[in-house]
């Protein structure tokens, strides 16, 4: 039967991509339906109980700046928070949190259930309704037909999912959940380019059977306690817990090597490629044979469970080998395994067949987000979900889409990498992937993106008011530092030596003083004159977030300005569109190889064309000349 209500957007899947997609579409004003095989698993953390990390934390902050759910849910569920790379520059500092799985899932579900314009419905999707080259809806396993202007598919690892433990395997979307085989078969019929990838998870341990006395404790940051959301507060966090560290050893490695003949990875049973930056323990032992040991982080899964996630020993080895390797680890000699580790192999679709909006090129109105695009990680999935959901809503409403640029957001880097370069292994975000990372910091994600989110309808009044106050306060304080001057009479020698290491001999602005390497904003605001009065303070010192933002903007102003100059030069051609119907065979000045690559990839802009492997700068120059001729010819014809 046809469901009586029609929708603007249907989102298929309730993982990290699907939930952000549904929330974004609904916030943008679209009548949105989220279809999931099980409402109880909305927002489920299928693998590790953590959010964030290098590059990943930047994505979470960007999702938050655009009104998304992940960061605030992490603040409500996080049981340990840390700033990684805290001793390095602000561009590569990243927030990471351990999360209570149940609290996180509950926080996401609460946001979904309280979001206007959003309906939830529990049914697995078996088919897509396609008329010509336009998607018009989805069909569930009991034959219900839901109609919509656009569909966002976020199927995760469920498409023809195959779970491996040793040489045994069975169909599944993840442990305990059925696969989406019918939907996977339907997508094959649509002849979208696809492949197989693999990921894995470690066995879970009963924490009561661990000897913590021989382990290294890893507490979270306490002064100050980090928060993820720009609207978050440390007071939102539940009780905090430590993690623990152990190490593999020669005995562990011997056990693993002895079981490789029964490993599905090394016996050829698994065809899919696994994630390079989150390898299985058997892959680590094989690839880094000269390494004597590897760290294993024992991470709590929640406040009301004894279950421990041993991060670093993801495996698909047979259970008897898993049993031995776990018991070879210091502190885990008597550990009780609650769940075996496994690998899962699944279908993904070549993201080069997507537009930069994450809409498929072949089928209008059909958007893909998350692991279906060849990525790995909750954060990468959430970011894609938000973008796909927003663009699906905009398209359904007849509005222009939004495509973030590489200089605007890590989300822009992520999408551009996917649609221009594709993937040969699960894609993970790193700060090193962003050429403009000094401008793409965690701390300024809201200053970069919240105004855009407001324009798209993604940002509510509460977030907008908080952002506006922060933006204005930072701008006013930066301007005050530039326009306030001090001289040797105002800043006496002893005070200057304490602050700067030497007396000043001429007049300086406060901004100039703050740019010096050893001067902090806090020290500058606390400096006093001979009369005991504050030289320049207190400024915004009472608000640590504002103080850090002001210090970063002032100290790195020169570097950021130079980077922005680079961006402006680059943008002159970066955004130049390439006609969708361009005949590359007519560009005879290009080599046959380059023409073939451009015909295969069909880049949307000159910037994308330049990033296609094998397309040289000389080829781009020739393509630009051809586009000028086309433009001149069309103008002449019109005249």
From Swiss-Prot:
Complex and partners: Homodimer. Heterotetramer of two MnmE and two MnmG subunits.
Main location: cytoplasm
Cellular component GO terms, alphabetical: cytosol
Functional summary from the UniProt entry: NAD-binding protein involved in the addition of a carboxymethylaminomethyl (cmnm) group at the wobble position (U34) of certain tRNAs, forming tRNA-cmnm(5)s(2)U34.
Binding site for NAD(+): 274-288
Phylogenetic placement of the source organism: Bacteria, Pseudomonadati, Pseudomonadota, Betaproteobacteria, Burkholderiales
Positions of FAD binding: 13-18
Protein name: tRNA uridine 5-carboxymethylaminomethyl modification enzyme MnmG
Cofactor dependence: FAD
Similarity field: Belongs to the MnmG family.
Subcellular location, record wording: Cytoplasm
Gene Ontology terms describing biological process: tRNA methylation; tRNA wobble uridine modification
Entry keyword set: Cytoplasm, FAD, Flavoprotein, NAD, tRNA processing
GO MF terms, alphabetically ordered: flavin adenine dinucleotide binding
Annotated gene: mnmG
């Amino acid at each position: 039967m046809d469901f009586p209500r029609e929708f603007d957007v249907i989102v298929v899947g309730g993982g990290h991509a699907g939930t952000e997609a549904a929330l974004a579409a609904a916030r943008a004003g679209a009548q949105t339906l989220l279809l999931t095989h099980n409402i109880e698993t909305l927002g489920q953390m299928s693998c590790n109980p953590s959010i964030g990390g290098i590059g990943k934390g930047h994505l979470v902050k960007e999702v938050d700046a655009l009104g998304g759910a992940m960061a605030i849910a992490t603040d409500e569920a996080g049981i340990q928070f840390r700033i990684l790379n805290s001793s390095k520059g602000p561009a590569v500092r990243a927030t990471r949190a351990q999360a209570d799985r149940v609290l996180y899932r509950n926080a996401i579900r609460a946001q979904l259930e309280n979001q206007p314009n959003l309906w939830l419905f529990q049914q697995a999707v078996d088919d897509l309704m396609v008329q010509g080259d336009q998607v018009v809806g989805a069909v569930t396993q009991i034959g219900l037909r839901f109609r919509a202007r656009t569909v966002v598919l976020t199927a995760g690892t469920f498409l023809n999912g195959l779970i491996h433990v040793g040489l045994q395997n069975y169909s599944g979307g993840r442990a305990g959940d059925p696969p989406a085989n019918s939907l996977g078969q339907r997508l094959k019929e649509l002849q979208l380019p696809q492949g197989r990838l693999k990921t894995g998870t470690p066995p879970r341990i009963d924490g009561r059977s661990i000897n913590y006395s021989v382990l290294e404790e890893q507490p979270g940051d306490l002064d100050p306690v980090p928060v993820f959301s720009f609207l978050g507060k440390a007071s939102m966090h539940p009780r905090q817990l430590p993690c623990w560290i152990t190490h593999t050893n020669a005995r562990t490695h011997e056990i693993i090597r002895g079981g490789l003949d029964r490993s599905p990875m090394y016996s050829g049973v698994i065809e899919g490629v696994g994630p390079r930056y989150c390898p299985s323990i058997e892959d680590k032992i094989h690839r880094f044979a000269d390494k004597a040991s590897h760290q294993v982080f024992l991470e709590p899964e929640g406040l009301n469970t004894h279950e421990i996630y041993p991060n670093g020993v993801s495996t698909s080895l047979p259970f008897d080998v898993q049993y031995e390797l776990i018991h070879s680890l210091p502190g885990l000699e008597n550990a009780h395994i609650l769940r075996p580790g496994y690998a899962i192999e699944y279908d993904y679709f070549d993201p080069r067949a997507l537009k930069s909006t994450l809409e498929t090129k072949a089928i209008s109105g059909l958007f893909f987000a998350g692991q279906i695009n060849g990525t790995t990680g909750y954060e990468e999935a959430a970011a894609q979900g938000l973008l796909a959901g927003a663009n699906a809503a905009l398209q359904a409403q007849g509005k222009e889409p939004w495509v973030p640029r590489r200089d605007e957001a890590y989300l822009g880097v992520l999408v551009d990498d996917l649609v221009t370069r594709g993937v040969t292994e699960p894609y993970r975000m790193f700060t090193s992937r962003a050429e403009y990372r000094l401008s793409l910091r965690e701390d300024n994600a809201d200053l970069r993106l919240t105004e855009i989110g407001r324009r798209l309808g993604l940002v509510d009044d509460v977030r907008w008011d908080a952002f506006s106050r922060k933006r204005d306060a930072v701008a006013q304080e930066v301007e005050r530092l530039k326009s306030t001057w001090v001289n040797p009479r105002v800043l006496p020698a002893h005070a200057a030596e304490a602050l700067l290491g030497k007396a000043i001999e001429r007049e300086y602005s406060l901004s100039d003083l703050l740019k010096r390497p050893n001067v902090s904003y806090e020290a500058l605001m606390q400096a006093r004159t001979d009369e005991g009065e504050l030289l320049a303070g207190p400024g915004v010192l009472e608000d640590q977030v504002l103080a850090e933002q002001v210090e970063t903007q002032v100290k790195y102003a020169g570097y950021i300005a130079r980077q922005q100059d680079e961006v402006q030069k680059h943008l002159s051609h970066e955004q130049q569109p390439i006609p969708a119907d361009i005949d590359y065979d007519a560009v005879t000045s290009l080599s046959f190889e380059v023409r073939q690559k451009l015909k295969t990839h069909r880049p949307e802009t000159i910037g994308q064309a330049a990033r296609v492997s094998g397309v040289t700068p000389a080829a781009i120059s020739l393509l630009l000349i051809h586009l000028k001729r086309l433009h001149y010819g069309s103008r002449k014809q019109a005249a």
